[in-house]
Amino acid sequence: MSLDIDQIALHQMIKLDEQTLELVLRDTPLDVSPAVEDMMAELHRVYSAKSKAYGIFTPESELADAVRSCRRGNENFLAFSRTATGRLRDELAKYPFAEGGTVLFCQYRYLAVEYLLIAVLGTCQSMLVNEQLDISSTQYLDIHHADIVACIDLTEWETQPASTRYLTFLKGRVGRKVSDFFMDFLAAAEGLDTKAQNRGLLQAVDDYCTDAALDNRQRQEVRQQVHSYCKEQLQAGEDIALVELSATLAPVSDKTFQAFSSEQGYALEETFPADRGTLLQLTKYAGSGGGVTLNFDAHLLGERIFWDPATDTLTIKGTPPNLRDQLTRRQNGK
């Protein structure tokens, strides 16, 4: 599917010292060339594949007001982007890990949905070989490692103002999280908690199995069914839909999974994004601490792996060959 760019603008922040980020602002929007289209298509693809947090604008959000004004035609896109870059610089300059970069604002359409993407892209050095086979240095935008990115689903924001998921941004960074200062720049509050939704789903599945009085084998089959559906949705870039998931599971006492989860008050949305790490708990047990790391398939519990909660002891029958080899060699002093 093609990505159609409406407007795009680039600016730069140059780090002069620990407290100063200098601005270099474009006087004209960027022309939409094939190279620009390829860049945005790649940025959209990379961003879509990453784990994101959801937010909503607060009533005091200056950025939200500026976007509304721009959308109404009260301010042109370039002027909006220049002002917003200044606010972003002021916010980033408060933190010791602030770095310069190319600031990108792009309004585009993808699959009949309008988006506004804001990103700060770092620059990397590389080597270039020309037609004469001479080598020279070159620079490129480090799109694949971009971690300061936010995207507004303009269509959802304007048509469903009560939504809790029209604003997304990337999570996590060494030190203070990117999400923290980007939330300050966006003047946004936490929106849909994807991990909480997925944890709620796992709890609902376990309770559903308990209510049906399923044995361990049947319980694991249900968990595998749920995991398979959620994995397919994740790979397709689609949300988990309770009505679809419910259709894959056998009813309990003539009650569907969707009806069960609604009556039990798990507060699950009708649709929500899949969280890979949380959903892995459907088919795996994993944990680490005190120098020990364990990870095994859930169906092995009670078959080859046994846990005694009274003594907090885990017994493993049949160790992996590579581990057994290491233990044997260490015991024999080799």
Swiss-Prot record:
The keyword Cytoplasm applies. Signal peptide: none annotated. Keywords: Cytoplasm. One of its GO terms (molecular function) is single-stranded RNA binding. One of its GO terms (cellular component) is cytoplasm. It is found in: Cytoplasm, Nucleoid. The keyword Cytoplasm applies. Coiled coil: none annotated. Pfam families: NA37. Its main location: cytoplasm. InterPro entries: Nucleoid_associated_NdpA. PANTHER family: NUCLEOID-ASSOCIATED PROTEIN YEJK, PTHR38772. Belongs to the YejK family. This is Nucleoid-associated protein SG1574. It comes from Sodalis glossinidius (strain morsitans). The lineage of its organism: Bacteria, Pseudomonadati, Pseudomonadota, Gammaproteobacteria, Enterobacterales.
